[in-house]
Curated annotation (Swiss-Prot):
This is UDP-N-acetylmuramoylalanine--D-glutamate ligase. Cell wall formation. Catalyzes the addition of glutamate to the nucleotide precursor UDP-N-acetylmuramoyl-L-alanine (UMA). Keywords: ATP-binding, Cell cycle, Cell division, Cell shape, Cell wall biogenesis/degradation, Cytoplasm, Ligase, Nucleotide-binding, Peptidoglycan synthesis. It holds the Pfam family MurD-like_N. It is an enzyme of class 6 (ligase). The lineage of its organism: Bacteria, Pseudomonadati, Elusimicrobiota, Elusimicrobia, Elusimicrobiales. InterPro entries: Mur-like_cat_sf (IPR036565), Mur_ligase_C (IPR004101), Mur_ligase_C_dom_sf (IPR036615), Mur_ligase_cen (IPR013221), MurD (IPR005762). Belongs to the MurCDEF family. GO terms for biological process: cell division; cell wall organization; peptidoglycan biosynthetic process; regulation of cell shape. Its main location: cytoplasm.
Amino acid sequence: MFKSSKFKGKKACVLGMGKSGLAAARLLAENGFSVLISDGGKREIPGNLHKNIEVETGGHTNKILDCGFIVKSPGISSNMPVLKKIKNKKIPIFSEIEISISFLPKGCRIFAVTGTNGKTTTTMLLSEILKQFIKNKEFNKNVFTVGNIGCPLAEVMSEIKQHDLIVMEVSSYQLEDSSYFKPYAATILNITPDHIDHHGSFKKYLDAKSKIFKFQTQKDIAVINSADKNCLKAAKNIKSKLYGFATTPLQQIRSHVFYDGDELVFSAGERISPPKLPGIHNVENAMAASLLALAAGVDSQSIQQAFNKFKTVEHRIELLGIKKGISFINDSKATNIDSTIIALRSMPDGKKTWLILGGQDKGSPYGVLLPLLETKCKKVLLVGQAAAKIKKDLPGYKYFNVCGTIDKAVEYAFNNAQKEDIILLSPACASFDQFNNFEERGKFFKQIYKSL
């Protein structure tokens, strides 16, 4: 657990000069710490850095080993040689969220959302619910939406006041690095194999996700998907008050909310219509957000009002429009196989979908896609570094076309698709082979759509 008073006078080292690393460095510098930012890549050093911040790029020097504590950016592999040196010297390592939380004003409550899929949508839903509740009750509070969603907590720390609410999307990378993280209310939406290339095994990935509940007490709230066996494992020994949701009929008996095909039905008697978003996965996201809110004292009217106003999340099964009778759907946020499965389940049967698949491989097998490809897809257009592995993992599927890049895939699909067909970008892979992030990939797809 990071306490600034314990490390007073000691130099901090921030490993990685990404968005969260820079935000953590600035926060520490503004609170009197001398900071070394060390980045292994050849990055451009930002202007207007605080006078207490020193930067080294292009490699990690032994200056790191003279620091009193380390802040590890979430994308950095735990197997890096420099981290082994740090651990051998027993220098404490913290995550950006741990550092940031230590500077939070009194009375702030953290609502944390994790899961393999659905994190961003659920985070946004919960934020809108809390904002609506505060507006209805005329409370003098603000809601800050932070974390893996794109805005580090450290970046907005100067704006946060006592008793404000923090809604945080938390990734397995962030949880892995946290020695102490205690949200007031937290949910695990689902857990399926992902990021195995980073964590090394599914067990380590599951262990990282499970840390969201680890330090909670009986006064805290935990929400899980009762139909997900891995979520049940993650919640096995928790101390917090546990709530469950499920769309699967067999699991409804041990859930606090289920879906009757029309409304969310809560064990306390409330009935709420879910937001108008495609797919059963979004019903589950709405269940998780509403359970967190209800358990924290939010009324059902505020939840319903927020759901009625809610619009789809950018880059997640996002309908861009229709051209020549062909629908274009941007699901660039599908950076793993399970996300693509969810997207394909949302598509109509009858082989009308032209699926753009591929990018940077993350180590999971693609064979599980076969049943959906056979029932939903007219053709699969392969792009990026993972193309060869996808073909190898799906020897029984014949309708591939290797396009290499997204623009070529769209051109091929648009020239061959018929009225009422769908061109779906849902890559099931990371974007880093051709783009900086999934947002950039999604925006590129949107630009192509607009240019047709």
